[in-house]
Amino acid sequence: RTDEWLQTSLVIEGDLGFAQLTVVGSYYDRETFYQHDTQSYAAYFMYVIGAYYATYDFGTDPMGALTNDQKNESKALEVRLTGIGDRLSWTAGMFYMDSDEHWDFTSFVDGYASSTAFATWAGYAAYYGFTVPESDTWWFSAQTTSREDKAVFGEFDVKLTEQLSFLVGGRYYEV
């Protein structure tokens, strides 16, 4: 297994006289790769899901592994102004985040191309006019996700009496 990552953050605060400024930023970058032995459970697929699922018949003692290769990256920024007075307190700000994730997941079985499982999948594919190349990979999936969040927000708190105040706030965001 390899796991390399970097996570940073920075907070800047300052008094502007009329309001308190807070700026918060962060950055995250992680790359992971792991491999696990699948022999302990691949042999039992047929016993658990039954003979109707010949696509999982890897033989009596299959040896294999699974791998996951993944990369995550995100950046975030929030800027806030806060004012505190005798009767009125308020906050206004904005938020931005950009994140990306990509992973490849692969399961292998040694000799898969000569197994009943491969022959079954190849037969299904041939019926629909496709050819499945011989490989020890019996499962592959990949996903890439990108997300961008933006928001603005604000809040006002008005002190009406010593015992009563009126508070209103809101947030508008796009994902």
Annotate each predicted stretch with a short phrase.
Residues L6-L10, K75-V79, E148-F156:
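Hydrophobic, lipid-facing positions within transmembrane beta-strands of outer-membrane proteins
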Residues V11-D15, Q20-S26, E31-T38:
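Membrane-embedded beta-barrel scaffold of Gram-negative outer-membrane proteins
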Residues F18-L21, R87-W90, Q163-F166:
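Repeated loop/turn-to-beta-strand initiation elements of outer-membrane beta-barrel proteins
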Residues V23-G25, A92-M94, V168:
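Membrane-embedded beta-strand positions of outer-membrane beta-barrel proteins
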Residues Q70-T82, D86-S99, F156:
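Conserved C-terminal beta-signal and adjacent last beta-strands/turns
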